[in-house]
Amino acid sequence: MTSKTKNIDDIPPEIKEEMIQLYHDLPGIENEYKLIDKIGEGTFSSVYKAKDITGKITKKFASHFWNYGSNYVALKKIYVTSSPQRIYNELNLLYIMTGSSRVAPLCDAKRVRDQVIAVLPYYPHEEFRTFYRDLPIKGIKKYIWELLRALKFVHSKGIIHRDIKPTNFLFNLELGRGVLVDFGLAEAQMDYKSMISSQNDYDNYANTNHDGGYSMRNHEQFCPCIMRNQYSPNSHNQTPPMVTIQNGKVVHLNNVNGVDLTKGYPKNETRRIKRANRAGTRGFRAPEVLMKCGAQSTKIDIWSVGVILLSLLGRRFPMFQSLDDADSLLELCTIFGWKELRKCAALHGLGFEASGLIWDKPNGYSNGLKEFVYDLLNKECTIGTFPEYSVAFETFGFLQQELHDRMSIEPQLPDPKTNMDAVDAYELKKYQEEIWSDHYWCFQVLEQCFEMDPQKRSSAEDLLKTPFFNELNENTYLLDGESTDEDDVVSSSEADLLDKDVLLISE
């Protein structure tokens, strides 16, 4: 999707037919919106660019329209194959999320029988594939800052997006603004820690349902990672309640009553089936999702941010291309090593074995993510795929000195060209120092995003406080500390709309 509008003659006939059919399926919509073109398509929906004929939407949600005076909106047609609950969930979350300039709000929703559309602002932006190889470190900083600001707002509502990826974060390079879209897979985060605050609570949680009987679902959602805080070094119980499988039965050690799980499972199955929400896009899913952790949190979105940042620094997209969960874990092994993956698996009560690998580094890259990115860039520099003016050489130069010359955060940079005057030489040296510092702190953020333990992985709010974003944060607050950012500001007209105008499908 870009800011350019196609000529009607350039629109393919099949797209024209789709738009005519949409008018037919939703009678009366032609009086409010004029369809312009189809701008996107996914598994569960299609998105069309349209003109807001009445001006009602563009007026009430003016802060969300980046081009002043724009009257374009996006109509998202949700396919009838989507379950009613899924449709309700997405519309309801969009409704709840209204209030941030970095999250696309639900402006309107219409339903005729099984046909449902959601009306959102139209955001002119550039496709990620067109700029990820050329975005300088300052642009990378702004991109990730905008994304983390959006996630900070979403996570503050207790919502997990679950599908963070470049196509769901629309970024306008000229304006330096981004917006998070597509809440089709989003869900509320469960408060597992309050559900299981002690060993006795664990017994009740694992073995009973709301009616006082056994709940299979509770066992499927339980993950040993929830109980780690109960077994800290200061705790009297140094060994967590292990679970073993014997003849189709789950036996909880430490004098916890066993529960027969034979019913509903294969008769001779000796392994407890582990179920968890694995929704998301391959290549962007966190280890706990791949390992079917039942206690997933907003931290899975932070891992996805790390994948995007890795693509920007390594100038490669997509970064991971595995077709299944097992291959996804092996891809992580090549970077972090199978020993790290084994530790991660143990957090979730799993074992992890990897044999016959061509890449046989149990500890992964010795210098971690810096060495991995250096390896990616070095290969491209060797074969000459970067143009001579590429900003990738700034990252490559930083890593070259960081890994091989072992320079400090304030390196002795090369002297500027001798034919420069003193002012130009000073400005160049200052620029070089800023670039070096930005890269140093950027890799700190990257490492925090890729923390294997979700409880230790930084939140969006924590990442925004890192030195990497200092210069952007300074522009966000007044001297007295009052926020000047529009992120949490809702106009009075938008607030009124929340109460009056948008009617959602009832559960």
Swiss-Prot record:
Keywords attached to this entry: ATP-binding, Cell cycle, Cell division, Kinase, Magnesium, Meiosis, Metal-binding, Mitosis, Nucleotide-binding, Serine/threonine-protein kinase, Transferase
| Gene Ontology cellular component annotations, sorted alphabetically | centrosome; chromatin; chromosome, centromeric region; cytoplasm; Dbf4-dependent protein kinase complex; nucleus
Q: Which residues form the Protein kinase domain?
A: 33-469
Q: Which InterPro entries match?
A: Kinase-like_dom_sf (IPR011009), Prot_kinase_dom (IPR000719), Ser/Thr_kinase_AS (IPR008271)
Q: Does the keyword ATP-binding apply?
A: yes
General function of this protein: Serine/threonine-protein kinase. Needed for the initiation of DNA synthesis during mitosis as well as for synaptonemal complex formation and commitment to recombination during meiosis. Required for HTA1-HTB1 locus transcription repression.
The catalytic activity, as recorded, is: L-seryl-[protein] + ATP = O-phospho-L-seryl-[protein] + ADP + H(+); L-threonyl-[protein] + ATP = O-phospho-L-threonyl-[protein] + ADP + H(+)
Which protein, by its recorded name, is this? Cell division control protein 7
Enzyme Commission number: 2.7.11.1
- Quote the PROSITE patterns the UniProt record gives: PROTEIN_KINASE_DOM, PROTEIN_KINASE_ST
Catalytic residues (positions): D163 (proton acceptor)
For this entry, list what GO says about its biological process.
cell division; DNA replication initiation; double-strand break repair via break-induced replication; mitotic DNA replication checkpoint signaling; mitotic DNA replication preinitiation complex assembly; negative regulation of exit from mitosis; positive regulation of kinetochore assembly; positive regulation of meiosis I
Q: Which family does it belong to?
A: Belongs to the protein kinase superfamily. Ser/Thr protein kinase family. CDC7 subfamily.
Q: GO MF terms on file? A: ATP binding; identical protein binding; metal ion binding; protein serine kinase activity; protein serine/threonine kinase activity
Fetch the CDD domains from UniProt. STKc_Cdc7
Mention any additional remark. Answer: Present with 1600 molecules/cell in log phase SD medium.
**Subunit (UniProt):** Associates with DBF4 and ORC2.
Which enzyme class, named as a word? Answer: transferase
Which cofactor is recorded for it? Mg(2+)
Q: Which organism is this protein's natural source?
A: Saccharomyces cerevisiae (strain ATCC 204508 / S288c)
Kindly list the positions annotated as binding ATP. I39, G40, E41, G42, T43, F44, S45, S46, V47, K76
Q: Which Pfam families match?
A: Pkinase
Q: Where is the signal peptide?
A: none
